[in-house]
Amino acid sequence: MASGGNQSPPPPPAAAASSEEEEEDGDAADRAQPAGSPSHQIQQRFEELCSRLNMDEAARAEAWSSYRSMSESYTLEGNDLHWLACALYVACRKSVPTVSKGTAEGNYVSLTRILRCSEQSLIEFFNKMKKWEDMANLPPHFRERTERLERNFTVSAVIFKKYEPIFQDIFKYPQEEQPRQQRGRKQRRQPCTTSEIFHFCWVLFIYAKGNFPMISDDLVNSYHLLLCALDLVYGNALQCSNRKELVNPNFKGLSEDCHPKDSKASSDPPCVIEKLCSLHDGLVLEAKGIKEHFWKPYIRKLFEKKLLKGKEENLTGFLEPGNFGESFKAVNKAYEEYVLAAGNLDERVFLGEDAEEEVGTLSRCLSAASGTESAERTQMRDILQQHLDKSKALRVCTPLTGVRYVQENSPCVTPVSTAAHSLSRLHTMLSGLRNAPSEKLERILRSCSRDPTQAIADRLKEMYEIYSQHFQPDENFSNCAKEIANKHFRFAEMLYYKVLESVIEQEQKRLGDMDLSGVLEHDAFHRSLLACCLEVVAFSHKPPGNFPFIAEIFDVPHYHFYKVIEVFIRAEDGLCREVVKHLNQIEEQILDHLAWKTKSPLWDRIRDNENRVPTCEEVMPPQNLERTDEIYIAGSPLTPRRVGEVRADAGGLGRSITSPTTLYDRYSSPTVSTTRRRLFENDSPSEGSTSGRIPPQPLVNAVPVQNVPGETVSVTPVPGQTLVTMATATVTANNGQTVTIPVQGIANENGGITFFPVQVNVGGQAQAVAGSIQPLSAQALAGSLSSQQVTGTTLQVPGPVAIQQISPGGQQQNPGQPLTSSSIRPRKTSSLALFFRKVYYLAGVRLRDLCIKLDISDELRKKIWTCFEFSIIQCTELMMDRHLDQLLMCAIYVMAKVTKEDRSFQNIMRCYRTQPQARSQVYRSVLIKGKRRNSGSSESRSHQNSPTELNTDRASRDSSPVMRSNSTLPVPQPSSAPPTPTRLTGASSDVEEEERGDLIQFYNNIYRKQIQAFAMKYSQANAQTDTPPLSPYPFVRTGSPRRVQLSQSHPIYISPHNNEAMPSPREKIFYYFSNSPSKRLREINSMIRTGETPTKKRGILLDDGSESPAKRICPENHSALLRRLQDVANDRGSQ
């Protein structure tokens, strides 16, 4: 229920009052509220909260005004004080004037105090703050700050869970300490206790972490920083007089000479970093680097500032009775000042007695006298775990295209161990390499017609300078930040040369001795490859990486960046699971919205392709299409992916079972085709195209064929061959005379189809002109060639082509059934076609998932897909600066409406939010109007962003007058109502003259105008008339995994099993129940056992009396299975 008081629906946008009028009306309304009204009680509680926080008047007024504005437009569910705390935090982080420096960010009000006074936990605050940012439409920099704040909290929460068991491993339990006696003024300097060391070590760690902004939200480096703190404190504890009461004697890292004895300890403390790393999931090399370059210099500065007292030369003595009290107090005070100045979370809350209430997390295990957890602690531990699972800060969500193949992380795997494993795999990959080409790569580059070695080196040098300039370090630690940047780029160079060598080798295996100078001189390829390497290095050190920052600083268009992702994954075997999933996420982001930006090269490629977007059937392999008549492509089921298996090669989208695409295809321009399948009725052929209209039929590749003799050919179908029949073909000669030719076609041995003219009628006389006409291929009829020149004549196909399969019994297969030839290839392989193949595959997977959750039938799903494909092909600019999911949700809604199977936008968006890529901004911030580039496409695309006066009866019935705040949750909650977007109340922070609104506004004003006419053709009213054919749906086929090494220490691999479609034998044995004799069963058993067909004739005997090798019976020591596999291999080799 709403707790914001009696609220009336907001007025329509056109009648909205100005901000000044709203403030005046609001003030008058506040003065008119009776003392006992809910609004008055809320304001009274707000005033009390501000008084407790000593809030300044400007922040108080701004927070109250913002809260009133939100409560008028949204239903703010839950405790009103929690929403007021969000408004106060936003107001406190605004710039305020100062006496000396002009302005400063923040008013030094602690976030922790705001949450304590409003009785709100941190987890609740982050959940509500995300909704508040959406409702208020806060600028991106504020959202980034909140995300960084949440990430810092998440990192600290995870590290604190690791801190407790590590501390218990090296120090004694607090309950083992002797109870402290009451100390007088003269007895203050007593030895420190384990509990005090526990608090001191944590405060020292979080203070150091906060002063390293480049690693403060880095889980791996922050964890290593904690190990450095424990190493320092442990070494100091060994030198304390009461070290027997502090150090755990069972600690495995304690050597014999360091055991606590009565004798005086050594002056130099021991280093236990290596032992801590081996016992607690650390990386020794990384931890020692952090200790030498970050930790030690920082601790020396603390000694110089007198925050730590002791021996500065060896960083000891601060645990001595005379120094510990003052050192602890000074570090605590310095940390408090940092928290107030930076506005960050006070991470000492993890140590407090009320940690469950303040954080929503587990209590300190060191304060528990018993080893068992209470019900409250178990509940709070579960709350924290749910937040960590829901937060995407420290884990990579499996993309929807891979959730059925890869099992989620095991619950016993911690974020620290996962991050450490990713970094460890990176070090293993790069071990023994240098940031320069290997001797083998140098030879390969020199063998090119134009040696690109120097150009590659110059490009890397330029990109390093760019990377160093954009790496913005903190001024106090510029040297450390620069060293991190140098280290990351050096790792990226090593990985770049390693992957480049693998890519070139793979290309040479596919293309033979073809010169690769053209591809290796492609600047976009090299920049994309190095940017991808840098992203992998950045992600391994600090999830979730730096994308799209890396691509932007190098000016790499996203449309070019995506091309290298699959190449990178295929070329590098050592990538860990998390890195592959991260690259998959990047690829999906590019495909669903980043590549569709206004200035993307994608629009240039479409314009080069005659402003034409290829259809799904044109770019997808036929075996990956689900036919509209529900007949699936025949063939044996491919090997399913095993649970928990690393599927690096399946990380991309739309992986087909055909051979991988070459680099040349990925970076080539689209091939212009003048022939086009007219899928939609309003799709008229362009000038110069053939007049033939080819229905959606599976096609085979064209192959060169020989001329037909100059006589009339009679085609006799042969069992096992494919007969292609066509009614007529019209030939226009050079003199303009029209010739009508009946033709027939036979599938040849190479997988092509040869067409033969049967008879030519010229002026009523039959003439044989086949000698002057070459046989035609199916590719010519499909339109993949610009034109078909046939010895001075032009062939035009006025009628459809029927492809029929000739069965052994002489019966023909029904027209329209899919072919099972293993030689079927996609029609188009240009870079544009590859892009749309992945887009269609991604959209198909997401749409299928939504339809399952919305309980949509397969018939309606195919209609929705046809509508979506229509919007992509005919209304392409609908995607400009928009999101693929927006068009999918609109297509679901409009097709459900016209077919009377209504699905509300509320339910559609509710199901959408369950997908891993879902973000509330997708349906809350949709482009309505803005400066748009006209790509010169059809007239219907040029004015699609203009507002239209349409009846809103279809969508308005699904919308409620007040938006519920829970609609912004990334994951639906049981208590949340379905989302009903309305207008955004905050000031727009987008580009100037750009108007944005919610998804329903986009549907009413723009989408419906473009789609309505086409969608109505599938309505029940038009069911009796001819409706457009349904587009084939992408069929998800799982491929076999690639060769994967199980262990870096042992050469054990899992290799893929080639499970392609088995060719049907020419001789078959049929058994009919209650009809065939028993002899037929014995023949079948004999064929399976021996691998020979009983009806085969004996092979011709050779001179030595043996049979032909092809007819020889399998030896007894070989199984029939091996024989059959060998036959299959021979058949494939001959193709």
Swiss-Prot record:
Region of interest: Disordered: 1-43, 661-698, 930-994
Compositionally biased intervals (Polar residues): 661-674, 683-692, 935-950, 958-969
Sequence segments annotated as region (Pocket): 414-1021
Principal place of residence: nucleus
InterPro entries assigned to the protein according to its UniProt record, in alphabetical order: Cyclin-like_dom, Cyclin-like_sf, RB_A, RB_B, RB_C, RB_fam, RB_N
Keyword annotations of the record: Cell cycle, Chromatin regulator, DNA-binding, Glycoprotein, Nucleus, Phosphoprotein, Repressor, Transcription, Transcription regulation, Tumor suppressor
CDD domains with a match to the protein in the record: CYCLIN_RBL2, CYCLIN_SF
Glycosites: 417
Annotated GO MF terms: DNA binding; promoter-specific chromatin binding
Record PTM: During G0 and early G1 phase of the cell cycle, phosphorylated on Ser-636 and on 5 sites within the domain B. Phosphorylation on Ser-669 in G1 leads to its ubiquitin-dependent proteolysis.
Stretch list, region Domain A: 414-613
Pfam families (alphabetical): DUF3452, RB_A, RB_B
Region of interest called Domain B, as start-end residue ranges on this chain: 825-1021
Family named by the database record: Belongs to the retinoblastoma protein (RB) family.
Protein role: Key regulator of entry into cell division. Directly involved in heterochromatin formation by maintaining overall chromatin structure and, in particular, that of constitutive heterochromatin by stabilizing histone methylation. Recruits and targets histone methyltransferases KMT5B and KMT5C, leading to epigenetic transcriptional repression. Controls histone H4 'Lys-20' trimethylation. Probably acts as a transcription repressor by recruiting chromatin-modifying enzymes to promoters. Potent inhibitor of E2F-mediated trans-activation, associates preferentially with E2F5. Binds to cyclins A and E.
The name this protein goes by in its record: Retinoblastoma-like protein 2
Organism for this UniProt entry: Mus musculus (Mouse)
Origin organism lineage: Eukaryota, Metazoa, Chordata, Craniata, Vertebrata
